[in-house]
Amino acid sequence: MEVLRLIRIFFVKIFILNIYNIVSNKKYKNIIYIINEFSRGYMNRGKNNKQSKKKNTKKREVDLFPALKNTVDGDRYGYINKDGEVIIPFKFTRAYDFNEFGLAIIKENNKFGLIDIKGNYNVNPQFDNINPYKEGRAIYTEKSKMGVLDEKGNKLRGVVYDYIGNYNDGYAVVAKMNGKSSKYGYIDLDGKEITEVKYMHANDFNDGFGLIKIKDREFALIDTQGNISNTYNFEYVGSYGEDLMVFSILLGGPYGYINRDGEIVISPIYCDAKGFNDGVAVVSRSNNNIICTHGVIDKLGRQIYGEIYSDIKHLGEGKIALGLPIGDNSIFPRSIYAIGDSLGTLLTKFIYLNIGMYINGLSYGSDDKKTFFLDRYGRIVKNLPMVDGSGELRAKGGIIHANIDYSPYYLDKNNKFIYQPNKEFPLDKKYSLIIDKYKPNINYLIYIPQVKGIHDENVEKEVNSKLRKISFYIPAKEEVIDNEPNIIEDQVLSYNYYGNFQILFYKDNSLIIDLLGYYYSLGAVNGTPIRKTCAIDLLTGRFYKLKDLFKSDTNWRAILNKIISGFIENDPSYEYVFPGSFKGISESQDFYIDKDNLYIYYPPYKIGPYSAGVITFKIPFTQIEDYLNSQGDFYKKFNG
């Protein structure tokens, strides 16, 4: 049997080399067909495999669920019951599941708090953030410090650190900063330090031990009493789990595995090695500069899956997602996945573009059109909902929660809607806004605002056409047909794009709306936020420009340039602006206004680093009142 397995691996490697050659000039669907034809026989060998099953812990029944409502003031969340009836009103800007203690994390007025099942505040919104409860504890952030909430929402007294990680195995990593350096340690569920906060680094507890770095080339495992179990003198030690750790003798690898006693179990031969999970680990020996391939080994270093995959993910419950490359991006390829088990059995064809974690024998997967439930063998569950779009599906409290294309909703098991967010909302009694979904490809999605109720149908058509055109983001080299990006449904894009909008201001036929987006090129360190602001007169359909705010016979550009240059030169909060990058106000300058101020803004990289985000200059109208056309339509409509 071992010989047959090695023969299969040999032919799989040959096959993948051929795939690399054809991926760039074959259509996406043809590639899927070739891969699946190859894997047809290989996958069938495990269908009768009897795998040990872990006992599932039944969770407490949940009877209230967070639900979204779209409004003129932005996203608002409340809670519904299993019948879709609203139990707690839509008043929060974020809302999360109720936990086993009957508490839910909510966000209101840009602060986080806790509510009970009646919607009453258990903890008033006061925190900058609250992490989801784990092991009966939630980590909060307040004024750049972190603390712990117990199961009743009470702060653990005296527990304040610069950093606290989520609890794992009853303990949490904590850190104190001293200048540019940090020291780490652990606290228990009561907030008591089990060891002094003095280590260079600390990892989450796992299987009763925490891995710490004492100093360079000295690592150790610490037990639940804070005692050092063993030390390890290597350049790197990490990813402790299932009694094994990744290690390297030299800085930057190669990597292998040691046991708790510090004995080398698997020699350091890998350029990349992950921790063990369900008895297996993901490794790579790839020296190919074009594409890094991965495989799976067991605790003896034996190959379970050969190093031929572009991506491998642990799915839990003994399942693994194995990805093969698709598309013409050979350095950072997308992957199409099959499901295998930790024994080396391929359970499915390579047909999934996304696969979720297994929980109680169920997962979910997506292809280029739909999302569906998967059973423990990776098969689509026919008697549970299948929905259009891509995202997540989970059984929750006897109903189905779907988060598809960034839109959360609920279904019953017969695929009937229990609750879904509204796709239209009123601006006032006259106008409403329709949320129009544009998704030509699984990796390109925009929600486009469309105005309804403009008296003149031609004006309405013109306004909506312009909003649609401005909403599109067209990357370099992308074709344009009829003012729309020419994106093909089964095209494998080398980027992701998501767009949405928010209303900044509405009053008496006057609308200011932000068209927002996020562009991410595969392999990039960061994506690029996209923002375009439109100020619209809904009576005439006019889109105002910055010049419309000022008197035409004044040198308003010069005064704005002077003010912004002053900010850059004298205000420490703008010290990150690239020297000499501000060239003055442009003809198509991005801006928006409120009742009292003008805001001039620049996207990341334009005049500052990505880390600065969108750089905005706030200019009070009182500072430029001599230049403002206070009798003009623009100013009067938005400030009259």
Where are these regions (language model features)?
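Short loop/turn segments that connect beta-strands within beta-propeller blades
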Residues: K82-D83, I117-K118, E151-K152, L189-D190, ...
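A short beta-strand motif characteristic of beta-propeller blades
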Residues: V86-F90, Y121-P125, K155-V159, E193-V197, ...
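An edge-strand/N-cap motif at the start of beta-rich repeat modules
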Residues: N44-I88
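Positively charged N-terminal leader segments that act as targeting/secretion signals
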Residues: M1-L4, R8-F10
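Compositionally biased intrinsically disordered regions enriched in Thr/Gly
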Residues: F15, Y42-N44, A67-N70, G74-G78, ...
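Repeated scaffold domains used in trafficking and secretory/extracellular systems
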Residues: K54-N56, F92-E100, F127-K134, Y161-N168, ...
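Solenoidal tandem-repeat scaffolds enriched in leucines and small polar residues
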Residues: M146, R157, D162-K176, S181-I258, ...
